Amino acid sequence: MGNVWSLTSQMFPPKPKWTVDDMPDLTGKVVIVTGGNTGCGKESVRVLLLHGAKVYLAARSEGKAKEAIEDLKKETGHEAIFLPLDLADLVSVRRGAEEFLSKEKQLHILFNNAGVMLSPMEMLTKQGYDLQFGTNVIGHFHFTKLVLPALLAAATPTEKARVITTSSSANYMGTLNFDLWADGPARNKKAPGDMYVQSKHGNVVFAVELARRYGAQNIISHSLNPGSIRTDLQRHLSPFANKMQDIFLFPVSMGALTQLWAGTSPEAGQMNGEFMIPWARLGKARKETGDPEVGKKLWEWLEAQCKDY
């Protein structure tokens, strides 16, 4: 009952008590936003630029990224920096991390914002994983680990570095099944919705485990449900489903709010390994996401998948 209540109650959150006007000045801070060319990512980049941050907009499509950068420059007067990153290809992930590290010694905030939702089951990553789990979890894990030296270099006891990972209310709808993530008979019995739940639950487990492993080194790691937001994530839904969903969806300005709060507010900087809910509030993920044994198992599994890339 608790998981169902958490899921449904977050669809209609109370009015926010925190807005982007409450964000601190971010001059001198280096930030990466994955999936920054569209949706909540693009809105987050916009607000971060307005608050003085140096922002790397990480995206797969150079054309779409540069179009977004131009739009944002016209709107804010500041220019984000394109970082090529295809989270569905672990080789591309390494190249993207290496390009960033060749330009910057420090990374103050990483927003693991990009995501794939309800993609057809025949769609796989370059290395043969389910596209949703591979992009949302494996790709972000690999990228985070590779840029960790820059996060650690930026982190101090008074100014901790932050990693903010976007999950969703789908984390409440199931637990991890390690047999489903690579292409094979077990996965092929499942539907896109099942795999989305796997990835969003996995996002929270990863974020909690990151906090557990690196909190003592001044790394803050939170995950969040951005809310029910009108974005390109719905592109794999049917026109009818999109129309029905649209009734319940909020604009991206609201969708970016919770991750910006988690990534920049002093209040969120006093916590670690937490799950944030709309709008800009502390919440609770499904209890299994905090199990240290599950976190350790997932982390070690992810390391094994990424070690050759």
Swiss-Prot record:
EC class of the enzyme, as a word: oxidoreductase
Residues the entry annotates as binding NADP(+): K64, D86, N113, K145, Y196, K200
GO molecular function: oxidoreductase activity
One Pfam family per UniProt: adh_short
Listed pathway(s): Secondary metabolite biosynthesis
Applied use: Melleolide sesquiterpene aryl esters are cytotoxic secondary products with anti-cancer potential. Armillaridin shows therapeutic and radiosensitizing effects on human esophageal cancer cells. Armillaridin induces autophagy-associated cell death in human chronic myelogenous leukemia as well as of hepatocellular carcinoma cells. Armillaridin can also inhibit the differentiation and activation of human macrophages and thus might have potential to be developed as a biological response modifier for inflammatory diseases.
EC numbers on record: 1.1.1.-
InterPro entries listed in its UniProt record: NAD(P)-bd_dom_sf, SDR_fam
Record has Ion transport as a keyword: no
Source domain of life: Eukaryota
Active-site residues, as the UniProt record annotates them: S167 (proton donor), Y196 (proton acceptor), K200 (lowers pka of active site tyr)
Leftover remarks: Armillaria species are both devastating forest pathogens and some of the largest and oldest terrestrial organisms on Earth. They forage for hosts and achieve immense colony sizes via rhizomorphs, root-like multicellular structures of clonal dispersal. One genetic Armillaria gallica individual localized in Michigan's Upper Peninsula stands out as exceptionally large, covering hundreds of tree root systems over approximately 75 hectares of the forest floor. Based on observed growth rates of the fungus, the minimum age of this large individual can be estimated as 2500 years.
Role description: Short-chain dehydrogenase/reductase, part of the gene cluster that mediates the biosynthesis of melleolides, a range of antifungal and phytotoxic polyketide derivatives composed of an orsellinic acid (OA) moiety esterified to various sesquiterpene alcohols. The first step in melleolides biosynthesis is performed by the delta(6)-protoilludene synthase PRO1 which catalyzes the cyclization of farnesyl diphosphate to protoilludene.
PANTHER family found in the cross-reference section: RETINOL DEHYDROGENASE, SHORT-CHAIN DEHYDROGENASE-RELATED
Family to which the UniProt record says this protein belongs: Belongs to the short-chain dehydrogenases/reductases (SDR) family.
Name of the protein described by the UniProt record: Short-chain dehydrogenase/reductase ARMGADRAFT_1048226
Organism in which the protein naturally occurs: Armillaria gallica
